[in-house]
Curated annotation (Swiss-Prot):
Enzyme Commission code(s) on record: 5.6.2.1
Catalytic activity: ATP-independent breakage of single-stranded DNA, followed by passage and rejoining
Protein name per the record: DNA topoisomerase 3
Matching PANTHER family: DNA TOPOISOMERASE 3-ALPHA, PROKARYOTIC DNA TOPOISOMERASE
SUPFAM superfamilies registered for this protein in UniProt: Prokaryotic type I DNA topoisomerase
Keyword tRNA-binding among UniProt keywords: no
Organism this protein belongs to: Bacillus anthracis
Domain of life, source organism: Bacteria
Pfam family, one: Toprim
Disordered: annotated segments: 686-718
Domain Topo IA-type catalytic: 153-594
Length: 729
């Protein structure tokens, strides 16, 4: 009997699909049943070949050999995962297999993972596509009942290949040109470089900012009411101190007459459902989680616990076909503290409206929402529980009615000047009940603060006991943190050097710099390349990052290039542009930037050379700030030796409770805190043993230290290493 091979992206998803399809016979890298053989990739198993596979001379990085422009880029099996590639290949080539079902992640990159494997195997069998947004049993069954023809995704595949090949031509050539021309480990790309440029621009804004003092007036009445002065244009601030001084002097011994009490009934609706970027922003603001960390937690909740839908989505809406599943999802997530809230929603028919249901705003995947899967909180880690809480509360909030309140504005006259006060009376808590009325609106910047207003009638006279001048200073723009950098990457139009509205709109509609799936990796890569560094929560550009921006061609610094590329990649995905035309343009552009770098007369200066020599090659080591501590890195790219000098750990200072830094090597390591606290590693081990009731042994401490090291080191797995060399996205 003929069978179908199902290619999943990861083993965990493959196991879920195999269970639903009753494939319980285990093989080498696959699971088999009567109709289906389920096998899996491990992320990418196949990638674009290194330059040296085209010509042995490219093994050495020489400026005169650039640009490297092979006529056709080749695919190669990633060495570290070759065993699994061969396992997939053997199943695809079986004579009893007459169909391939692509079940990798439903998106551009997922399409590439499977199609590159199929292309490398050189197999020509009919392809079908499984396109689902969650991996619950129900979603898998429904997906297999509605498989799509593979041909429907040919253009999406062409778009994914075009992006990868363009990044190879431009990224590898620009990086080699910069590194060999300026004798420094420099890398750039169409997303990395403009992101660094945005951080530099923000620092320049802060540096050039000149604070101005502004002035206002506040009147306090005997019934504890605070009144705020406003000019004829409704402004509460003035930069003219003399003017404010004069007004204050003229108001002495005047009382306030109530001219008007304006009552307005207002509504506010819940913020939209989460896409990945919005979730990463909130997790960073509330819990300090990095974008990468939030994505990893979401992946667990999606794949392992099966309680949330696909994380790598750029939509904040659900499609109309999902509305019918909402009651089941509410029942599933309506446990524990969420039970009364979910029960309240289920009492009435769910009203689907355009604020969260819009087919036109859902492309590959809908917003992140709970699945119909069983929720077992005892299996969650603390971090998983926090992320799940964010998603469930947002899901419940959009299903609750609007927050309704009465806005009261009190307008008074003191002398000849206008003073106002504002208050709010809640009429119906609505969606804010989900957040126990503690939801904070980020955009509230009004100088007139809301207060509890006493009972007052129009025409009343209020006794003024104090009139005082207030003052403040204008603030410089805040430095980027991971939350605000994600926002800037998502909508970088203010940093573009073009007035082309269509291009700006395309950048906005295609999600800005990078994609929801790649932004976390891009930020991580910038930290690991020492182009940016973290001080507290703030992100700073390094000297290396500054110099890179001075050395790269101007176009590579602007989001405009990404806007143009995304416009064309979108056209390829829609079948409106041939991949070959786009790649031809990219090759020509590569020639231009390599030529510009070659002819540059600028110099790169290492200003972080340490007194230490590299133990491998003897060259001076560079001292750099890694994401979680200081490191020594060999300045020779081909050597690549690096070593931790210190790293921030999760151990807390017993005096000030801040995170301790671990310095030194071996038995001589010490924990140090900014407050001045110092503790030897051996003493720390003894203290931990006592605190845990003598249960901790040497193995426990070693395990703890190993975990710290694992958290500190950059992502290092076979596909990450291969992709690090080839993808500059």
């Amino acid at each position: 009997m003929a069978k179908s091979v199902v290619i999943a992206e990861k083993p965990s998803v493959a196991r879920d699909i195999a269970r639903v399809l009753k494939c319980d016979k285990k093989g080498n890298g696959y699971l088999e049943g009567s109709k289906y053989i389920v096998t899996w990739a491990l992320g990418h198993l196949v990638t674009l070949a290194d330059p040296e596979s085209y010509d042995v001379k490219y093994k050495k990085w020489n400026l005169e050999d650039l640009p490297m422009l092979p006529e056709r880029l080749k695919l190669t099996v990633i060495k570290q995962t070759g065993k699994q590639f061969n396992a997939v290949k053997s199943q695809l080539l079986r004579k009893d297999v007459n169909e391939i079902i692509v079940a990798t992640d439903a998106g551009r990159e997922g399409e590439l993972v499977a199609r590159w494997i199929i292309d490398k195997v050189r197999i020509n069998k009919p392809i079908k596509r499984l396109w689902i947004s969650s991996v619950t049993d129900k979603a898998i069954k429904d997906g297999f009942a509605n498989l799509k023809p593979g041909k429907a995704y040919d253009n999406l595949y062409a778009s994914a290949v075009a992006r990868s090949e363009a990044d190879w031509y431009i990224g590898l050539n620009a990086t080699r040109a910069l590194t060999t021309r300026f004798n420094a480990q420099l890398n750039c790309g169409r997303v990395q470089t403009p992101t660094v440029a945005m951080i530099a621009n923000r620092e320049d804004e802060i540096k050039n900012f000149k604070a101005q003092t502004y002035y206002g007036i506040e009147a306090q009445t005997t019934n504890q009411l605070k009144l705020t002065w406003q000019d004829a244009n409704g402004n509460s601030r003035s930069f003219n101190k003399e003017k404010i001084d004069g007004i204050v002097k003229g108001l002495d011994k005047h009382n306030a007459t109530v001219l008007e009490i304006d009552k307005k009934q207002k509504k506010s609706f819940s913020p939209g459902l989460y896409d990945l970027t919005e979730l990463q922003r909130d997790a960073n603001k509330k819990f300090g989680y990095s974008a990468k960390e939030t994505l990893n937690i979401m992946q667990k909740l999606y794949e392992q616990h099966k309680v949330l839908t696909y994380p790598r989505t750029d939509s904040r809406y659900i499609s109309s076909d999902i509305v019918g599943t909402l009651p089941e999802r509410l029942k599933a997530c309506g446990v524990g503290e969420y039970r009364p809230l979910a029960h309240k929603v289920l009492q009435k028919p769910i009203k689907a409206n355009k604020s969260f249901v819009d087919d036109s705003k859902v492309s590959d995947h809908h917003a992140i929402i709970p699945t119909e899967g069983y929720v077992n909180f005892s299996a969650f880690t603390d971090k998983e529980r926090k992320i799940y809480d964010l998603v469930v509360k947002r899901f419940l909030a959009v299903l609750f009615p609007a927050f309704e309140y009465e806005q009261l504005t009190l307008r008074t006259k003191v002398g000849n000047e206008t003073f106002i006060a504002r208050g709010k009376t809640i009429l119906h808590a609505g969606w804010k009940e989900v957040y126990e009325n503690r939801f904070e609106d980020d955009d509230v910047t009004d100088d007139v603060k809301e207060q509890l207003l006493p009972r007052i009638e129009k025409g009343d006279t209020l006794t003024v006991k104090l009139i005082m001048q207030t003052s403040g200073q204008t603030k410089a723009p805040a430095r980027f943190n991971e939350a605000t950098l994600l926002s800037a990457m998502e909508n970088p139009t203010k940093y573009m050097d073009t007035q082309n509205k269509q291009l700006a709109d395309t950048l906005k509609s295609t999600g800005g710099l990078g994609t929801v799936a790649t932004r976390a990796d891009i930020i991580d890569k910038l930290f690991n390349s020492f182009l940016i560094e973290k001080r507290g929560k703030d992100i700073h550009i390094t000297s290396k990052g500054r110099q890179l921006l001075d050395l790269v061609p101007e176009e590579l610094k602007s989001p405009t290039l990404t806007g143009e590329w995304e416009q064309k990649l979108e056209a390829i995905a829609k079948g409106k542009l041939k991949k070959e035309v786009f790649i031809s343009e990219m090759k020509n552009y590569t020639k231009e930037i390599v030529s510009e770098i070659k002819s540059s007369d600028k110099k790169y200066k290492h200003d972080n050379i340490s007194t230490k020599s590299c133990p491998d090659c003897g060259k001076p080591m560079l001292e750099v700030n890694g994401k979680k501590g200081k490191m020594l890195v060999c300045q020779d790219r081909e050597c690549g030796h690096r070593k931790n000098v210190s790293r921030t750990t999760n151990a807390r200072c017993p005096q000030c409770k801040k995170k301790l830094e671990l310095r030194g090597e071996g038995a001589g390591q010490i924990f140090a805190c900014k407050c001045g606290y110092r503790e030897k590693l051996s003493t720390f081990q003894e203290r931990r043993k006592k605190e845990s009731g003598n249960k901790a042994d040497k193995r426990d401490v070693q395990k703890y230290m190993k975990q710290q090291k694992k958290e500190e080191e950059p992502l290092n797995n076979p596909f990450a290493e291969a992709l690090k060399k080839l993808k500059f996205d």
